[in-house]
């Protein structure tokens, strides 16, 4: 691993730690991630300057300067989720704290041709109308699309879906509807991922 890759990995590790907590401190990050204080200070400074994290208060002091508490900036980036069913289209926008910013459910019958793709693209555009094109490119991390059935994520393929009456069906037409990365998932897997994955080491999702 090159020096640049190591720096990126360290920064990602710090961001992942912060994003899964209401608040934390530089001392806590150093201790929990086994990183030196100079490394933590330099990374936190950079993350604050970029607006990825924010100062959200101060810890009680037993003497000396009060330590600043820091947390993720929820509005730094967003992700969009789309749920496709036989008769409906669901859309949701979440921030970096996994909070739902906006949601909508529309009656839309699934059909396996390009007209459906155009309709999904139109509804998604209207759903994101509070963001201009530049904001969408900068702030939208990607789109996750949930589909009932057996999905091959790498090939962007529905192997089989009883609900949508599909078999070996390419999802590339849906991917082309967006200018950001698109990820496909089985509906049950997507629902499980939407839960707080950091609360439990092992979990079972029943639908």
Regions found by a protein language model. Name each.
Residues 1-31:
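Extreme N-terminal segment that seeds HTH/winged-HTH DNA-binding domains in transcriptional regulators
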Residues 20-21, 97, 198:
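Short helix-capping/turn signature of helix-turn-helix
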Residues 50, 97, 154-155:
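Residue-level recognition of short loop/turn positions
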Residues 66-103, 204-207:
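Gly/Thr-rich phosphate-binding beta-strand-loop-beta motif of the actin/hexokinase/Hsp70
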């Amino acid at each position: 691993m090159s020096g640049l890759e190591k720096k990126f990995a360290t920064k990602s590790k710090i961001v992942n730690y912060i994003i899964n907590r209401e608040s934390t401190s530089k001392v806590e990050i150093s201790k929990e991630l086994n990183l030196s204080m100079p490394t933590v200070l330099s990374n936190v400074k950079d993350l604050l300057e970029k607006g990825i994290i924010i100062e959200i208060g101060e810890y009680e002091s037993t003497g000396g300067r009060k330590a600043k508490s820091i947390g993720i900036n929820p509005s730094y980036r967003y992700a969009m989720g789309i749920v496709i069913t036989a008769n409906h289209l669901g859309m949701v926008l979440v921030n970096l704290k996994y909070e739902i910013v906006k949601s909508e459910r529309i009656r839309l019958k699934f059909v396996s041709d390009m007209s459906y793709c155009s309709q999904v693209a139109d509804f998604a555009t209207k759903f994101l109308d509070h963001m201009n094109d530049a904001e969408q490119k900068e702030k939208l991390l990607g789109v996750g699309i949930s589909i009932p059935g057996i999905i091959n994520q790498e090939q962007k393929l529905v192997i089989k879906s009883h609900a949508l009456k599909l078999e070996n069906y390419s999802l590339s037409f849906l991917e082309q509807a967006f200018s950001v990365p698109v990820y496909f998932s089985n509906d049950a897997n997507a629902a499980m991922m939407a839960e707080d994955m950091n609360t439990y080491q092992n979990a079972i999702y029943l639908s």
